[in-house]
C-alpha cells in the first residue's frame, strides 16, 4: 500500500539509498533468454535517497511519500522488497516506510534498485530476521540485476547480467553529475537493434587499466539530444561519460573545488550536483553503526 502521508515521529534514523556510477559499461553479448552479458565497474557516491522505517506488530506494509506520482516505480520496488523479505522469513509484523526521493528516475544512478536494497538491509536489521548478506543478495536479484551490488555495499567489478561481483578499490574521485531533463528507458536501450553487443570480454586487470567507456552512450546520445548536450558541455571540464543507460552523465575531478568550480558555470537550462566517490557505500556505513 502506498500513502502520501508526511513523515511521522518514532521512526528509525534515516537509512541512505545511495546512487551508483558505472565507471565503465561494456555489453559483451546477449544470452538465449534475452538478458545481456555485461562487464562493468560500480562505485557509490554520497548522493542518496533516504528511507525511514517504523516497525509495527500488524502485518501491513505501507509506503509513505510526498512524491508518489513521480516515484511510482521506486515505490513498487520498495514494497516488493519488503514483501519478499517478509515472505522468505515468515515475519509476522510489518512496517511503515517513509521515502525521501532525491535521485532521478531513469537517470542511470540506480535509484530504484538502491531503494530496494536499503529496504532489504534495513528491515532485516530492524526485524532482527538475521538473513545473511548472500541470501539478501539472492532475494535482491529477483527484484533487479543491480540490487545485489547495493546490498554488498562495496565498489565492485561486475560480470554476467551484473550479479557476479568482485570487490575493487578504484580512486574515490569527485564527480560533477549532470541530470538531463529526460527519462531514458533501460528496457528500450537494451532492446534497440543499434546497441553494440559484441565488445570483447577482457580480464579485470586489463579493464582496470584501459580508458573507460560506456557502450550505451552513443545510442542514447543519438536518441536524446539533452544527454548529448550535457556531455558536450561537461567534457570541456573533465573526462566525462554516461552512467548506466543514462540519462545522467558525470565528469571526474581530483579535487572537490574543481568540480564545484565547474558546477558554478553550469548553464541555466541544466541541473547537476557534486558528489564524492565512495568504495564503501553510505548504506554499509549506516549498517555498521547499529
Swiss-Prot record:
Residues the record lists as binding ATP: 104-114
Gene Ontology BP terms: isopentenyl diphosphate biosynthetic process, methylerythritol 4-phosphate pathway; terpenoid biosynthetic process
Record EC number: 2.7.1.148
An MF annotation (GO) of this entry: 4-(cytidine 5'-diphospho)-2-C-methyl-D-erythritol kinase activity
Source organism superkingdom: Bacteria
Pathway(s) annotated for this protein in UniProt: Isoprenoid biosynthesis; isopentenyl diphosphate biosynthesis via DXP pathway; isopentenyl diphosphate from 1-deoxy-D-xylulose 5-phosphate: step 3/6
Gene3D superfamilies: 3.30.230.10, GHMP kinase, C-terminal domain
Keywords linked to the UniProt accession: ATP-binding, Isoprene biosynthesis, Kinase, Nucleotide-binding, Transferase
SUPFAM superfamilies: GHMP Kinase, C-terminal domain, Ribosomal protein S5 domain 2-like
Reaction it catalyzes: 4-CDP-2-C-methyl-D-erythritol + ATP = 4-CDP-2-C-methyl-D-erythritol 2-phosphate + ADP + H(+)
Active site: 20, 146
InterPro entries: GHMP_kinase_C_dom, GHMP_kinase_C_sf, GHMP_kinase_N_dom, IspE, Ribosomal_Su5_D2-typ_SF, Ribsml_uS5_D2-typ_fold_subgr
NCBIfam families: ispE
Free-text function comment from the UniProt entry: Catalyzes the phosphorylation of the position 2 hydroxy group of 4-diphosphocytidyl-2C-methyl-D-erythritol.
Record family assignment: Belongs to the GHMP kinase family. IspE subfamily.
Protein name in the entry: 4-diphosphocytidyl-2-C-methyl-D-erythritol kinase
Organism: Shewanella frigidimarina (strain NCIMB 400)
Amino acid at each position: 500500500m502506498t500513502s502520501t502521508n508526511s513523515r511521522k515521529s518514532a521512526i528509525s534514523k534515516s537509512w541512505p539509498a545511495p546512487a551508483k556510477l558505472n565507471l565503465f559499461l561494456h555489453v559483451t553479448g546477449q544470452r538465449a533468454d534475452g538478458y545481456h552479458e555485461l562487464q562493468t565497474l560500480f562505485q557509490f557516491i554520497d548522493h542518496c535517497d533516504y528511507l525511514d522505517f517504523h516497525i509495527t506488530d500488524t502485518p501491513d506494509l505501507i509506503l509513505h511519500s510526498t512524491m508518489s506520482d513521480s516515484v511510482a516505480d521506486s515505490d513498487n520496488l520498495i514494497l516488493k522488497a519488503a514483501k519478499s523479505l517478509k515472505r522468505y522469513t515468515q515475519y509476522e509484523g510489518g512496517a511503515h516506510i517513509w521515502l525521501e526521493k532525491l535521485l532521478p528516475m531513469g537517470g542511470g544512478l540506480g535509484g530504484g534498485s538502491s531503494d530496494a536494497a536499503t529496504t532489504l538491509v534495513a528491515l532485516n536489521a530492524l526485524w532482527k530476521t538475521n538473513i545473511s548478506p548472500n541470501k539478501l543478495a539472492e532475494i535482491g536479484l529477483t527484484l533487479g540485476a543491480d540490487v545485489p551490488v547495493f546490498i554488498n555495499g562495496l565498489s565492485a567489478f561486475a560480470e554476467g547480467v551484473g550479479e557476479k561481483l568482485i570487490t575493487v578499490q578504484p580512486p574515490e574521485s569527485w564527480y560533477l553529475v549532470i541530470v538531463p531533463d529526460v527519462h531514458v528507458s533501460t528496457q528500450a536501450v537494451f532492446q534497440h537493434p543499434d546497441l553494440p553487443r559484441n565488445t570483447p570480454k577482457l580480464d579485470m586487470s586489463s579493464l582496470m587499466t584501459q580508458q573507460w567507456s560506456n557502450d550505451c552512450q552513443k545510442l542514447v546520445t543519438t536518441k536524446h539530444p539533452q544527454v548529448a548536450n550535457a556531455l558536450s558541455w561537461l567534457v570541456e571540464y573533465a573526462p566525462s561519460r554516461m552512467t548506466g543507460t543514462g540519462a545522467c552523465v558525470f565528469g571526474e575531478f581530483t579535487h572537490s573545488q574543481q568540480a564545484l568550480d565547474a558546477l558554478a558555470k553550469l548553464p541555466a537550462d541544466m541541473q547537476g550536483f557534486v558528489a564524492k566517490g565512495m568504495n564503501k557505500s553510505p548504506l554499509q556505513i549506516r549498517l555498521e553503526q547499529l
